[in-house]
């Protein structure tokens, strides 16, 4: 099965003493993954590394840390090597205000909103606007009935931020 094969290759990389390719990220650098899958890391943008992966009930989860965004070239390469696999991702790059997923139906990444109470609960993720608005109303101490109300309240305050998670085609 393709999922098991990819998982085995990730384990192989993780257990290596030295990376397949020289780099400053270690054995789980995305370039090493591209190499072990038969690709050329010089032709695929690989700026990042895998920080965690697990296989449970036939679902392979891979968490990466990358620079400036989701590594779509690596993702597309993996899908080319394993045509039966579909990779769903969630990308969060706070400094660039990027919050997006390709999981249109929310099977793996169902959250569509983030509320950040920097002095309280921290970042909270929400699937539905009603739940978000109820939480934000309590945190901000004011009644918020719409997303527009929330945007206005966040604009007028310090210590709170709000982000909608964009669903992208890919």
Where are these predicted regions, by residue range?
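Intrinsic low-complexity, intrinsically disordered or marginally ordered coil/linker segments
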Residues: 1-170
């Amino acid at each position: 099965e393709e999922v098991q094969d990819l998982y085995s290759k990730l384990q192989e990389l993780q257990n290596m003493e030295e990376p397949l390719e020289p780099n400053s990220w270690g054995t789980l650098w995305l370039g090493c993954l591209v190499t072990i899958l038969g690709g050329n890391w010089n032709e695929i943008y690989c700026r990042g590394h895998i920080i965690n992966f697990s296989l449970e009930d036939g679902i392979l989860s891979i968490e990466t840390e990358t620079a400036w965004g989701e590594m779509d070239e690596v993702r597309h390469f993996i899908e080319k090597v394993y045509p039966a696999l579909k990779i769903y991702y969630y990308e969060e790059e706070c400094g660039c205000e990027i919050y997006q997923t390709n999981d249109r139906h929310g099977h793996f990444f169902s959250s569509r909103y983030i509320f950040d109470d920097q002095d309280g609960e921290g970042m909270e993720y929400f699937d539905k606007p009603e739940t978000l608005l109820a939480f934000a109303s309590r945190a901000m101490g004011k009644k918020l009935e719409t997303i527009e109300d929330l945007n206005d309240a966040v604009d007028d305050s310090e210590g709170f931020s709000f982000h909608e998670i964009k669903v992208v085609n890919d």
